[in-house]
């Protein structure tokens, strides 16, 4: 038996899970309400299973918006090009400025590490789990990702826990104090020693019977690191303990919208749940009313001479005795009410289209839509999620990169990197979706500098200072781009030396030419000195 744990793990994993589950209950209820109007199967109830037939919402705006928003987040946060970079600290970079070759070699090595990390993410299908995680964040606002430690070249995918499968406790600053995950595993899939211990504790069990396995990750007060262990039927599993650095724990709890003082986050859909509910009720009323209106019912005057039996038996072109006044069709005459409901429904749908970043909401319809219009629309919609990008970059992307760096270094798939000198940075949102934004910044800076050419002869303007301020405003490091005073003087000295050499060579050539043409004998001697024969 393992020794008795202290601190946050004193009561055991299951006890902590049951205690923290009460704090999680309101967030689960809100997540179920949000899933009800979008995609109900994304966050099922505890009583649901694989055979549950979920009720489809009357409107598809929620489901379409959810998928569209998750796809846009996926492309913005995890584009196909490199979405993270490893940079050396500014102090180390300044030290290497005197050695351009050394700086280039460092950048080349860091780029290699970046490619290895990106290839590892692609080869282990991280994108599949990340897309599912983003959908959970939009609906439930919370999700937990677990990155198993790599084992050689084996396939090592990421594992996802829905909000209903884990609990988390944070301090007032949002730092994770402890987490408990619950995995339901068939008894026959457990290792033999664990099966014997479970049967000795709770009696014989069937192979297909489900067993709850709790994994407790908690912050150790003494070491400042995260400790981990697994528990089955109240017993700690031998050999399941682990230790993780505080900044590289493979269990990553993510929030969509963070609120100070709360251990869990709020979902994006929760902010627009009122519009979704209103649209659901309106669409249900409109659809049901449309079905009633589409039912064709004919009314016959009971005192008239027209007989319905003859009308139903008559073929096309037949003549039947009767009067048109005896026949009429039932009409609800609710067009005015329908118009009001349709107008309100369209207005709500337009608002939700903005919220879910649907381009059709603001992009005009036409055969020729300019690229500038598309960029403007994309910028308008991206601004809606500006804060979400910053949260996810700190709670999802940065921890993901740090964990992968630690794991790949431990398995010697990448070289050891000094933590104090190498810093992983994330580029997301409008500012830099991938590295293409760096080129755009550089092009903007060069274009702005080119516009300063007419002011070159103005004695009142300091062009060097204007160029520096333009670069700083755009966000470009001018190290190595703008020449320093020493470099300018050195360059001017080289140019002066080159001009002197060119002028001296020209003067020497003129003197030789004058001397050579002074007499035929001198011309022949000059031609012979350069390998030419006179007269050829």
From Swiss-Prot:
The keyword Iron does not apply. InterPro entries: Connector_podovirus, Portal_prot_Caudovirale. The keyword Disulfide bond does not apply. One of its GO terms (biological process) is symbiont genome ejection through host cell envelope, short tail mechanism. One of its GO terms (cellular component) is viral portal complex. It is found in: Virion. Disulfide bonds: none annotated. Signal peptide: none annotated. Its main location: virion. Keywords: Capsid protein, Viral capsid assembly, Viral genome ejection through host cell envelope, Viral genome packaging, Viral penetration into host cytoplasm, Viral release from host cell, Viral short tail ejection system, Virion, Virus entry into host cell. Forms the portal vertex of the capsid. This portal plays critical roles in head assembly, genome packaging, neck/tail attachment, and genome ejection. The portal protein multimerizes as a single ring-shaped homododecamer arranged around a central channel. Homododecamer. Interacts with major capsid protein. Interacts with the tail tube protein gp11. Interacts with the terminase large subunit. Interacts with the internal virion protein gp14. Belongs to the podoviridae portal protein family. This is Portal protein. The lineage of its organism: Viruses, Duplodnaviria, Heunggongvirae, Uroviricota, Caudoviricetes.
């Amino acid at each position: 038996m393992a020794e008795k744990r202290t601190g946050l793990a004193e009561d055991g994993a299951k006890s902590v899970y049951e205690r923290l589950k009460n704090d999680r209950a309101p967030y689960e209820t809100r997540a179920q309400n949000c899933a009800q109007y979008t995609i109900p199967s994304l966050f099922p109830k505890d009583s649901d299973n694989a055979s549950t037939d979920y009720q489809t919402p009357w409107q598809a705006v929620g489901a379409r918006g959810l998928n569209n928003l998750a796809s846009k987040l996926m492309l913005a946060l995890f584009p196909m090009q490199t979405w993270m970079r490893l940079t050396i600290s500014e102090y180390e970079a300044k030290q290497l400025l005197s050695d351009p070759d050394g700086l280039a070699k460092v950048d080349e090595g860091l780029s290699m590490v970046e490619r290895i990390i990106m290839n590892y993410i692609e080869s282990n299908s991280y994108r599949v789990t990340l897309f599912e995680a983003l959908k959970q964040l939009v609906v439930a606002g919370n999700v937990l990702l677990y990155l198993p430690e790599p084992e050689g070249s084996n396939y090592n995918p990421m594992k996802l826990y829905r909000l209903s499968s884990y609990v988390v406790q944070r301090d007032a600053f949002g730092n994770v104090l402890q987490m408990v995950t619950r995995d339901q595993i068939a008894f026959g899939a457990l290792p033999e020693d664990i099966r014997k211990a479970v049967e000795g504790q709770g009696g014989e069990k069937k192979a297909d019977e489900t067993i709850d396995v709790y994994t407790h990750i908690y912050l150790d007060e003494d070491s400042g690191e995260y400790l981990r262990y697994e528990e089955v039927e109240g017993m700690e599993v031998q050999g399941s303990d682990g230790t993780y650095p505080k900044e590289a724990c493979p269990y990553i709890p993510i929030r969509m919208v963070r609120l100070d003082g709360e251990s869990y986050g709020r979902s994006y859909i929760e902010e627009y749940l009122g519009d979704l509910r209103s649209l659901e009720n309106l669409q249900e009323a409109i659809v049901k009313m449309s079905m009633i209106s589409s039912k064709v019912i004919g009314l016959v005057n009971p005192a008239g001479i027209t007989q319905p039996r003859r009308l139903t038996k008559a073929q096309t072109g037949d003549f039947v005795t009767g009067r048109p006044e005896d026949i009429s069709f039932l009409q609800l005459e609710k067009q005015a009410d329908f118009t009001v409901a349709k107008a309100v429904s369209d207005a709500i749908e337009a608002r939700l289209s903005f919220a879910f970043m649907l381009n059709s909401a603001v992009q005009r319809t036409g055969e020729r839509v300019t690229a500038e219009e598309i960029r403007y629309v994309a910028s308008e919609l991206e601004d809606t999620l500006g804060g979400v990008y910053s949260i996810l970059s700190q709670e999802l992307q940065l921890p993901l990169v740090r964990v992968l760096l630690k794991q790949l270094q431990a398995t010697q798939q990448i070289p050891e990197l000094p933590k104090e000198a190498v810093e992983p940075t994330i580029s997301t949102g409008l500012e830099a979706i991938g590295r293409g934004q760096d080129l755009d910044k550089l092009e903007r800076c060069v274009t702005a500098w080119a516009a300063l050419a007419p002011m070159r002869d103005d004695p009142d303007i300091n062009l060097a200072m204007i160029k520096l301020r333009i670069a700083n405003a755009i966000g470009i490091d001018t190290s190595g781009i703008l020449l320093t005073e020493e470099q300018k003087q050195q360059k001017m000295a080289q140019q002066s030396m080159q001009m002197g050499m060119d002028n001296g060579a020209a003067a020497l050539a003129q003197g030789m030419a004058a001397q050579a043409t002074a007499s035929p004998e001198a011309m022949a001697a000059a031609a012979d000195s350069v390998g030419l024969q006179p007269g050829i």
